[in-house]
Amino acid sequence: MILIADSGSTKTDWCVILNGTPIKRIGTKGLNPFFQSEEEIQQELTHSLLPQLPEGTINSVYFYGAGCTPEKAPVLRRAIADSLPIVGNIKAYSDMLAAARGLCGHEAGIACVLGTGSNSCFYDGKEIVNNISPLGFILGDEGSGAVLGKLLVGDILKNQLSPAIKEAFLKQFDLTAPEIIDRVYRQPFPNRFLASLSPLDRKSVV
């Protein structure tokens, strides 16, 4: 049995492969070693992934995820090894490499990721050969859900948009200004929270 994972900061899509055939797809929360500790990743794997896996041992895991830099990938590999019944290799790569391989195959090209965060690279057909650090939603991640949500919330709370839009926004997401401040500055995963606010209902602004 082989596991392949594609993970952003908000969600992870898992595919279980048996004898070369995908047999099950599983969804869990995002696993990002840049924002989460080894223990937090283990907890998510144990509680959300393990109960949904078919019985048996896992021969290999191929994990492509946000935050899986060479420095942080070992954190993820250890968490997986300590949480799942694995007898083979655990490979952890960046989600950017997954996007490049999926988009370009064996050809050279530019690939981009746009989700809770954002990233881009130049790919030579085998590996990523040039990449500018996205820097996260505070310093970078331009165009991402977290940054769009941050800009929208900032304009709303500073009364840069009409009272009608502000009222519609707070009603749609069932939030107050103090609750937003608390979620951004005091609660974990403000990037996920801000990204969840970016899709303001079009009916609210027309």
Residue ranges and their predicted role:
Residues 52-91, 103-104, 187:
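Short beta-strand-loop/turn "lid" adjacent to the catalytic site in phosphate-handling enzymes
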Residues 128-174:
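Glycine-rich phosphate-binding loop plus the immediately following alpha-helix
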Residues 38-53:
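Short, well-ordered amphipathic alpha-helical segments that serve as non-catalytic structural scaffolds
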Residues 11-15, 23-24, 34-37:
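Short N-terminal binding/cap micro-motifs at the start of the first secondary-structure element
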Residues 160-200:
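Conserved ATP-utilizing enzyme core subdomain
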Residues 203-206:
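Conserved small/polar residues in nucleotide/adenosyl-binding loops
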Residues 87-111, 122-131:
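Active-site neighborhood for divalent-cation/phosphate handling
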Residues 1-20, 109-124:
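Gly/Thr-rich phosphate-binding beta-strand-loop-beta motif of the actin/hexokinase/Hsp70
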